[in-house]
């Protein structure tokens, strides 16, 4: 810790007498943070020692010193130069695991008979946990594979129990496991299946050692619906900063490469912006389209665009901000798009920054000072080979590869603060733009101004293991004392532990001594060298002089781990091919492997486990805090992470926090048309320039300038400027014809072998594989083991990154550099599928054919294979083949239009073969097909589980109904989740009383027997409270010993007032006092836990109270009243005094019972008599004070049962205090007794308001008349701190009885896992019973998820809403990747008496459409703002949702907004979009309207090829209109297996909606009865998809013959519906006059015969 923490004073408890020469000094040095269950080195040293000195080291618990946690012995003698070490190990006990406060131990060293003792902070960290996931991003329903490496502080494998939790993006734990890494060699391989229905976002795996819950390690992974990209994009600025004066602007290079290494051809859309903290300003004028040719492109942000796009008063206001650039690259084939962003390009005045982070803050006067100057580029990367100079000392140097330059300065011989200014001297940069920085270094403080110094210096080199380092020890001291310094003691710290100690001898006259050090792998990643000497200074006092230096070592693995390819490395790998991997590592190590598709890291490259990340975690746990040195000798040790104590009282300040002190944060100061537009802007001053600029913006609604100006709320000057510029630009626009935007280039298919059956399609496309753990066996002569593995590559054409992490019991953990395996072939298919498509929605997919042959065009036959789960141009009877030419070094997209018919994962397969070559490829991928409609999450119930209070005889029974699924999409599943969570006992929000406020209670007791107790009480209770609440670090750890000495003094003094009968009085000659004696018993019983108390004294007093002062009825009497009435608290009031005195004495007897029961035979009998007396009178007591004190006495005697407890609680005022008017101290005392009583009987529910009231009194004890109140409030609060946070009274047994399961599902909810969300899923929508028993509370939530039908028109009570959509007028400005554009018009008016404030438009886009964000920005950012802001959310189903916020909606005029919407992918049957308007303040006042392009616009039909429409309709019902159907045909088909029913029906009415049509049929004849027990004349609902409306052509009033299969019956009896599907027969049944027509006579006769045959004879089978 630095000088900013701990007491400001160095605790130099120096003796006042000069030391004699040869007077030995003993020192103890330990790390100032000791870790549990970890071996820690303690350094023991004697200076001027003689003979053998036996040293015993003991570690005790702090503060009580009740336990010996570790003990070791050693001997100091001439042989070891009076320097020795012992290793101690602190076991993990439950005291250390409690989460209250920091933990400390007392390390005690006994040198012969000289004791040296130091209190040291304890860390619960048992080691490190590193978590590796197989990928960084996952889709819903996939599996996360992860490994946890369990290592100790040396990074060696350790077998321990760990707790692992999976945490949602909202921070809720949904899975928790306790696992052991024993016998696992430190590697736990685990997995977790992500549910299909899951929250998107950043999930976490959190893990901690079971005995160190505070030290949590975590790894994040993202859950998202995505498709892996086929290429990656990198954005590289030409400079890592933007120089504010640079007239050339900022250029960025765009590099786009396919994952298999080939260059991309496409188009990049680039936009720049400025970032200021969290705020982003997009520079819309910078939007440019850049061609990507052969994988590269270039975009430039000009200085003018930057300055015009931001509204700062001066250019310098931009300094300190940063530039970001967003790039979207689209392939020329249009099949794939990848986004990339580069952020944090700083805007600077100087291209460099100077840091002093690696420089000590203290110097030794007249000695060299090593200034380590760290120079960085503005992005934080090291600036290499930059000249630097110190202005005052003219010392020059050059930065090395790591950006650091060393400048050695000769410091002056004075004690003043030393300012040092460093600047860069880079050629070509003007002086004003060179970087410069000043630091002030302070002189090292010597003891007694002795001017004795030590300075460590070392050469500036990058150290690697195996190299040697010479450290120079420079000495400066009084010449007369130099010869007394015969050696330096040095210590080396690494990873928070003492690694090595030694002595470096010094010969007489040596001013510089060299210590040679060999760097080993133990020194990685850095180490601290601390050195000191000791002498007796001129003033006769013992002095310690110290210095330290922090040394960086090159980060690398401690051991070896290399992954490489075996065999020929130049060979190109092909998909599915076998390859050889060669892995080299340490013998006996285990290595975890994984191969990851590089496309994963294009989407998310965060959270990869690397060796750098491992060292970062280790460095973060370093307990040293500065780059070296210190303000004095103690500061040197403390800042290096060491605790020092000597037998002469010299010591380091107490470290009280595991974290290093944070430095105080510095406060920071905080085209022709375009040209004419800029000229116009220049006519206006800055304050109204924005109004002019917004007047020249385009308006999507085409409002007039006058109408637009009505929306401005910025004053007349703004309106005037707006109107002028608006009208100016309108005239200009009429004169300019706008250029049409360029479209994406498309390759035309040319008109113009291997058989398809012989082509084996590639079908294995995992995102990761090779998830194995291998063991290294026999090593070679160099000690390195090699493992050779033959693996078969997967089918992806990509680059695989093979990652390896090894764990060795000798060399620890090591992460290898990734090994890349490129997989490709000259000709292949890339089949691009979306993440999911909707059943029955027509969609376009693309197969891209790539030809990487050098100079040969390929003639290719490509085929989409038939799959009955889709409608496409491939059918069971006819192949869909195309022939086309793919030019050399190029690609051709082949679009396919399909209609998915079945939900689930369906296969899409495309094959291609090249004419006249033996070349082919095939790809088979799965496409996720989801049901129509919107996913609905319906909360069925939320209930509180509290069996004790809500149940009968402790059993709570909850009947849960099924969800109402009346709007469910037919032929889809629902899933019900039953969620359970415990509710832990509410812990007090308020902190207990701050220990730092109790200093006034530590006081010296004195005076008579009463005064002495008045003085001793506060000290005893303060120590008890600070021990219980673990707050000594706030108070001062060294003060505890002082307090114990005062208690000992008070105890000794009190014995003077002990009379011969063992009782106590104010003076020896006064009558013995019952109250004082009982009070002595109470205080001494508590003090017995702190100091040695003679049990004869304590128990003699107990015996006197029982034998002399207790009457036969149990009451205690007082004959020697106390003189000092201020010590008796609430006893002053004489009302009910027998009860209150008896209760007081009984409490004292109970608290002394553990000590005195063996010595006082009558103790229990006396306690019972007093208890019975109190019980007889308790219910009649009136005084709140007496009720409280007697209640505590009864509780201690197990007698505070229900009627007495009710009496206690009912006496409280507002259930939080026991109050008598005008008696604040008595009320605090009484309430404290009551709190103790409730804690004893564990009535924790009643406790919180009482503790809150006591805390609110902010009563810190002390003052006249406060003895009892002080003692009781701190006794009560200490007991509360002890009991309630550890109170774990939650034990619920919950059983769920589902009708569809044979046995109930059982869960036990305990306090330890209360926050864990337990989940049960069922696919059945059924009611069920839940039974809860036990203690505590929990929450039950039941949520059903299903696909709901799109709702029809809703009634609109408070809003009028009109929505329309029409094609955008040409010419239209649209994104290049957009296929078409339309304009959405929304007009609304509020139907109330005044305007609706804060309203919201919730707009669901049509499938395949997205809004034009530029239009939305215009609507939201102009001074004539029409909307206040908008949010665009990508929903689960390829449908965008747009939220628009409006400040108000008028109640007199229609408010209208218009914006373009662009179609990005083609869908045959476009689902309608919807617009909902509602007021933020009244969510029920909503109105919804749907919108849809009409068929005449061609959007419904333009993709529908004739055969495909036919295919889609064939799945509507069983077709029979192609050929004449005979009677036998009908009989044969109606009697096929699976046919459930045959009816003659009449269509009563049609209910048409936006996705499904309902036909209400009356059953006129049951020709064959099925599983539905329907009667003639009843109505039944027949459901059909809207795509079948035209094919069915059902007419109201018409009669129909209908039959179908049992699987098409839907719902539960009696509400069964019938789905009309491909197995449903629907035939018009002519009747009446129609049958007279000749053409219908045969059909009518056949239908009548069919009906008769079926009814009379039935089916033959």
UniProtKB/Swiss-Prot annotation:
The record marks 1661 as: Coordinates Mg(2+) for interaction with Complement factor B Bb fragment (CFB). The modification Phosphoserine is found at residues 38, 70, 302, 670, 966, 1319, 1571. Residues 691-726 form the Anaphylatoxin-like domain. The keyword Lipid biosynthesis does not apply. PROSITE patterns: ALPHA_2_MACROGLOBULIN, ANAPHYLATOXIN_1, ANAPHYLATOXIN_2, NTR. Glycans are attached at residues 937, 1615. GO terms for cellular component: extracellular space. Residues 1-22 form the signal peptide. Pfam families: A2M (PF00207), A2M_BRD (PF07703), A2M_recep (PF07677), ANATO (PF01821), C3_CUB1 (PF21406), C3_CUB2 (PF21308), MG1 (PF17790), MG2 (PF01835). Disulfide bonds join 557-814, 625-660, 691-718, 692-725, 705-726, 871-1511, 1099-1156, 1356-1487, 1387-1456, 1504-1509, 1516-1588, 1535-1659, 1635-1644. Residues 1516-1659 form the NTR domain. Keywords: Cleavage on pair of basic residues, Complement alternate pathway, Complement pathway, Disulfide bond, Fatty acid metabolism, Glycoprotein, Immunity, Inflammatory response, Innate immunity, Lipid metabolism, Phosphoprotein, Secreted, Signal, Thioester bond. C3 precursor is first processed by the removal of 4 Arg residues, forming two chains, beta and alpha, linked by a disulfide bond. During activation of the complement systems, the alpha chain is cleaved into C3a and C3b by the C3 convertase: C3b stays linked to the beta chain, while C3a is released in the plasma. The alpha chain is cleaved by the serine protease complement C2b component of the C3 convertase to generate C3a and C3b following activation by the classical, lectin and GZMK complement systems. Phosphorylated by FAM20C in the extracellular medium. There is a cross-link at residues 1008-1011 (Isoglutamyl cysteine thioester (Cys-Gln)). Residues 947-960 have a biased composition (Basic and acidic residues). GO terms for molecular function: C5L2 anaphylatoxin chemotactic receptor binding; endopeptidase inhibitor activity. Residues 1632-1657 are annotated as: Interaction with CFP/properdin. In absence of complement activation, the C3 precursor is first processed by the removal of 4 Arg residues, forming two chains, beta and alpha, linked by a disulfide bond. This is Complement C3. It comes from Sus scrofa (Pig).
């Amino acid at each position: 810790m630095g000088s900013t923490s701990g007491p400001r004073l160095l605790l130099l408890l120096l003796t006042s007498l000069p030391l004699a020469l040869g007077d030995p000094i003993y020192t103890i040095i330990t790390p100032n943070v000791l870790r549990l269950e970890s071996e820690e080195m303690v350094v023991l040293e004697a200076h001027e020692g003689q003979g053998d000195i036996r040293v015993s080291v003991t570690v005790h618990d702090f503060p009580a010193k009740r336990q010996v946690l570790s003990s070791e012995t050693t001997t100091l003698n001439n042989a070891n130069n009076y320097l020795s070490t012992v290793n101690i190990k602190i076991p993990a006990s439950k005291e250390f695991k409690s989460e209250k406060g920091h933990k400390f131990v007392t390390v005690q060293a006994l040198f012969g008979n000289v004791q040296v003792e130091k209190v040291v902070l304890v860390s619960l960290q048992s080691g490190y946990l590193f978590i590796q996931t197989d990928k960084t991003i996952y889709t819903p329903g996939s599996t996360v594979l992860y490994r946890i490496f369990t290592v100790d502080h040396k990074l060696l494998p350790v077998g321990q129990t760990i707790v692992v939790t999976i945490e949602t993006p909202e921070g809720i734990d949904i899975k928790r496991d306790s696992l052991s890494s024993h016998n696992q060699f430190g590697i736990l391989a685990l997995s977790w299946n992500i549910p299909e229905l899951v929250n998107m976002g950043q999930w976490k795996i959190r893990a901690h050692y079971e005995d160190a819950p505070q030290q949590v390690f975590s790894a994040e992974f993202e859950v998202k619906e995505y498709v892996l990209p086929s290429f990656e994009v990198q954005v590289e600025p030409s400079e890592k900063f933007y120089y504010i004066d640079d007239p050339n602007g900022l250029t960025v290079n765009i590099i786009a490469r396919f994952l298999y290494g080939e260059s991309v051809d496409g188009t990049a859309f680039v936009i720049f912006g400025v970032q200021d903290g969290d705020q982003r300003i997009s520079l819309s004028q910078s939007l440019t389209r850049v061609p990507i040719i052969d994988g590269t492109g270039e975009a430039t942000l000009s200085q003018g665009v930057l300055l015009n796009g931001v509204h700062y008063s001066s250019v310098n206001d931009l300094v300190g901000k940063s530039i970001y650039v967003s790039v979207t690259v689209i392939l020329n084939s249009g099949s794939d798009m990848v986004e990339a962003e580069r952020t944090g390009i700083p805007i600077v005045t100087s291209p460099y920054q100077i840091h002093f982070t690696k420089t000590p803050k203290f110097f030794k006067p007249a000695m060299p000072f090593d200034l380590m100057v760290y120079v960085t580029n503005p992005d934080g990367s090291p600036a290499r080979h930059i000249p630097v100079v110190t202005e005052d000392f003219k010392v020059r140097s050059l930065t090395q590869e790591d950006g650091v330059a060393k400048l050695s300065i000769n410091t002056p011989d004075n004690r003043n603060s030393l300012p040092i200014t460093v600047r860069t001297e880079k050629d070509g940069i003007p002086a004003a733009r060179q970087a410069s920085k000043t630091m002030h270094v302070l002189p090292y403080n010597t003891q007694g101004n002795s001017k004795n110094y030590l300075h460590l210096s070392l050469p500036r080199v990058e150290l690697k293991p195996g190299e040697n380092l010479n450290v120079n020890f420079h000495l400066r001291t009084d010449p007369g004392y130099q010869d007394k310094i015969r050696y330096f003691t040095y210590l080396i710290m690494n990873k928070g532990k003492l690694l090595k100690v030694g002595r470096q001898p010094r010969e007489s006259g040596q001013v510089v001594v060299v210590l040679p050090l060999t760097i080993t792998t133990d020194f990685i990643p850095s180490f601290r060298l601390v050195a000191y000497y000791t002498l007796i200074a001129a003033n006769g006092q013992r002095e310690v002089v110290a210095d330290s230096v922090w040394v960086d070592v090159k980060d690398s693995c401690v051991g070896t781990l290399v992954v490489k390819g075996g065999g020929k490395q130049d060979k190109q790998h092909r998909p599915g091919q076998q390859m050889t991997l060669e892995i080299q590592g340490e013998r006996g190590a285990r290595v975890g492997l994984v191969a990851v598709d590089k496309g994963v890291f294009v989407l998310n490259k965060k959270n990869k486990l690397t060796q750098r990340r491992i060292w970062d975690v280790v460095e973060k746990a370093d307990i040293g805090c500065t780059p070296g040195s210190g303000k004095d000798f103690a500061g040197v040790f403390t800042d290096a992470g060491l605790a020092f104590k000597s037998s002469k009282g010299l010591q380091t300040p107490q470290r009280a926090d595991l974290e290093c002190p944070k430095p105080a944060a510095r406060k920071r100061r905080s085209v022709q048309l375009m040209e004419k537009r800029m000229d116009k802007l220049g006519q206006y001053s800055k304050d109204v320039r924005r109004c002019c600029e917004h007047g020249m913006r385009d308006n999507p609604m085409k409002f007039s300038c006058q109408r637009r100006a009505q929306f401005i709320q910025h004053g007349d000057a703004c309106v005037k400027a707006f109107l002028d510029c608006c009208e100016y630009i309108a005239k200009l626009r009429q004169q300019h014809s706008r250029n049409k935007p360029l479209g994406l280039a498309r390759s035309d298919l040319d008109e113009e072998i291997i058989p398809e059956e012989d082509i084996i399609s590639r079908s294995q496309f995992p995102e990761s594989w090779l998830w194995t753990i291998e063991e290294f066996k026999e090593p070679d002569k160099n000690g390195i083991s090699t493992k050779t593995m033959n693996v078969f590559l997967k089918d992806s054409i990509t680059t695989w990154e093979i990652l390896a992490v090894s764990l060795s019991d000798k060399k620890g953990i090591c992460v290898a550099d990734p090994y890349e395996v490129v997989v490709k072939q000259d000709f292949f298919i890339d089949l691009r599928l979306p993440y999911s498509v909707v059943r029955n929605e027509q969609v376009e997919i693309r197969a891209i054919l790539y030809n990487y042959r050098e100079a040969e065009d390929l003639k290719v036959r490509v085929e989409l294979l038939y799959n009955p789960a889709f409608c496409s141009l491939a059918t069971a009877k006819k192949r869909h083949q195309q022939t086309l030419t793919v030019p050399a070094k190029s690609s051709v997209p082949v679009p396919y239009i399909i209609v998915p018919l079945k939900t689930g994962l369906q296969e899409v397969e495309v094959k291609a073969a090249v004419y006249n070559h033996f070349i082919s490829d095939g790809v088979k991928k799965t496409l996720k097909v989801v049901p129509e409609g919107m996913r609905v999450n319906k909360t069925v119930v939320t209930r509180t589980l509290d069996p004790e209070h809500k149940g009968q005889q402790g059993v709570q029974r909850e009947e849960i109904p099924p969800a109402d699924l009346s709007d469910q999409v037919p032929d889809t599943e629902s899933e019900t989740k039953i969620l359970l969570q415990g509710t832990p006992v509410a812990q007090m929000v308020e902190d207990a009383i701050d220990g730092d406020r109790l200093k006034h209670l530590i006081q010296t007791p004195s005076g008579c027997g009463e005064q002495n107790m008045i003085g001793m009480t506060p000290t005893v209770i303060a120590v008890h409270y600070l021990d219980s609440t673990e707050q000594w670090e706030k108070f001062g750890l060294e003060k505890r010993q002082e307090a114990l000495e005062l208690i000992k003094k008070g105890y000794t003094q009190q014995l003077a007032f002990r009379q011969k009968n063992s009782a106590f009085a104010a003076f020896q000659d006064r009558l013995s006092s019952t109250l004082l004696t009982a009070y002595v018993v109470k205080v001494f019983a508590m003090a017995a836990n702190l100091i040695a108390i003679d049990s004869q004294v304590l128990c003699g007093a107990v015996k006197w109270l029982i034998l002399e002062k207790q009457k036969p009825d149990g009451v205690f009497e007082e004959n020697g009243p106390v003189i000092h009435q201020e010590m008796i608290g609430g006893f002053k009031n004489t009302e009910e005094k027998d009860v209150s005195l008896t209760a007081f004495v009984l409490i004292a007897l109970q608290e002394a019972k553990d000590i005195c029961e063996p010595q006082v035979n009558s103790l229990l009998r006396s306690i019972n008599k007093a208890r019975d007396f109190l019980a007889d009178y308790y219910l009649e007591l009136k005084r709140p004070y007496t009720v409280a004190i007697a209640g505590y006495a009864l509780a201690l005697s197990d007698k505070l049962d229900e009627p007495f407890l009710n009496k206690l609680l009912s006496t409280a005022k507002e259930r939080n205090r026991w109050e008598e008017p005008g008696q604040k101290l008595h009320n605090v005392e009484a309430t404290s007794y009551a709190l103790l009583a409730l804690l004893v009987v564990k009535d924790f529910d009643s406790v919180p308001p009482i503790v809150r009231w006591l805390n609110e009194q902010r009563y810190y004890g002390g003052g006249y008349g406060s003895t009892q109140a002080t003692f009781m409030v701190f006794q009560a609060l200490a007991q509360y701190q002890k009991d309630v946070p550890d109170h774990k009274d939650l034990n619920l047994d919950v059983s769920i009885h589902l009708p569809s399961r044979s046995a109930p599902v059982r869960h036990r909810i305990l306090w330890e896992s209360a926050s864990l969300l337990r989940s049960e899923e069922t696919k059945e929508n059924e009611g069920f019973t839940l039974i809860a028993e036990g203690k505590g509370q929990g929450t039950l939530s039941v949520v059903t998820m299903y696909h709901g039908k799109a709702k029809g028109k809703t009634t609109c009570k408070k809003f009028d809403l009109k929505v329309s959509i029409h094609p955008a007028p040409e010419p239209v400005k649209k994104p290049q990747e957009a296929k078409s554009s339309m304009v959405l018009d929304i007009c609304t008016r509020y139907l109330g008496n005044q305007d609706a404030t804060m309203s919201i438009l919730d707009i669901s886009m049509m499938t395949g459409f997205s809004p034009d964000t530029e239009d939305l920005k215009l609507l939201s950012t102009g001074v004539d703002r029409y909307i206040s802001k908008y949010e665009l959310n990508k929903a689960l189903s390829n449908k965008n949702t747009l939220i628009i916020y409006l400040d108000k909606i008028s109640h007199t005029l229609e408010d209208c907004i218009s914006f373009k919407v662009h179609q990005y992918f083609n869908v045959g049957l476009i689902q309608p979009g919807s617009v909902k308007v509602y007021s933020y303040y009244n969510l029920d006042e909503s109105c919804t309207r749907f919108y849809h392009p009409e068929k005449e616009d061609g959007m419904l039909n333009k993709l529908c090829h004739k055969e495909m429409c036919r295919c889609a309709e064939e799945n509507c019902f069983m077709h029979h209109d192609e050929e004449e159907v005979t009677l036998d045909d009908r009989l044969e088909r109606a009697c096929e297996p699976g046919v459930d029913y045959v009816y003659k029906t009449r269509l009563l009415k049609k209910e048409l909606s936006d996705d499904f049509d309902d036909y209400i049929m009356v059953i006129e004849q049951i020709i064959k009865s099925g599983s539905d027990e329907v009667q003639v004349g009843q109505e039944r609902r027949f459901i059909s998809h809207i795509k079948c409306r035209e094919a069915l052509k059902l007419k109201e009033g018409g009669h129909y013959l209908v039959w179908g299969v049992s699987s098409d019956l839907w719902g539960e009896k009696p509400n069964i519906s019938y789905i009309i599907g491909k197995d449903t027969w629907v035939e018009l049944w002519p009747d009446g006059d129609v049958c007279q027509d000749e053409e219908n006579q045969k059909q009518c006769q056949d239908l009548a015969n069919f009906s008769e045959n079926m009814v009379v004879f039935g089916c033959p089978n």
